[in-house]
Amino acid sequence: MADKNTFENEGKGPITINSNFSGAHDYFTNNVLPDDIRTHLRRIKAPTPYANNRDQVFMLVRAGTGKMVVNGIEYRLKPNTLINLGPFHRYRFIPDVGKMLEIVDSRMNSGTYVYMIANPYLKMEQFYVTSEPPVVYLTGLLADIANDSMNGLLGEMNVRSDDSTSICFCYMMDLLGILTEKMPKAYFRHDSGSGEKK
């Protein structure tokens, strides 16, 4: 049955447990989880024109230096910079003179992003997405995890197995986990009392 989980009870027959979550999972799988997670490697040698972002995007700088302008704010780029852009971010890349930016770009729909941030393992009571994108500079283990996740996403683009979408979702959870680990917790909270921008 679609809404039940069955477990074996040491040879005494199956135990059937009702699970309301399975219905939510089925809805997510059939209606929210995208079939077209897209990941590709970009090599940028010259300033790019502005682009209007429509998706949820994770970007990881692999090589080169320069800057990224998002909604009029400049962010320095160097290897192992991880960025998360949301819809309505307007951005462009400007490599340093004589440098080439190498960036892995992985995109998904916003419904999947909402499902990701609702993950109870994030242990965050509030999660607000501000107009300034989260940008973190990684070293050590977190840099290794981010690069491994992007390598996995690039690899799945070539394989496209039956499990590719679920595997890509797990890699993206790794990237979101890194952002929530590195960004100040206040970034994701909304202080309704002060009205001050932090």
Q: Where are the model-predicted features located?
A:
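Jelly-roll (double-stranded beta-helix
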Residues: 1-5, 48, 135-136, 162, ...
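Generic protein-terminus/edge-of-domain signal
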Residues: 1-76
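A hydrophobic/aromatic-rich effector-binding and dimerization subdomain
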Residues: 2-30, 34-36, 92-155, 177, ...
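Short beta-strand His + acidic residue motifs that chelate non-heme Fe in jelly-roll/DSBH
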Residues: 67-69, 85, 90-98
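Short acidic-glycine-tyrosine-enriched beta hairpin
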Residues: 72-87
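A short, Lys/Arg-enriched amphipathic alpha-helix from helix-turn-helix/homeodomain DNA-binding modules
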Residues: 143-146, 190-198
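All-alpha amphipathic helical-bundle segments outside canonical DNA-binding/catalytic cores
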Residues: 144, 157-174
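Hydrophobic, aromatic-enriched interface-forming segments
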Residues: 168-192
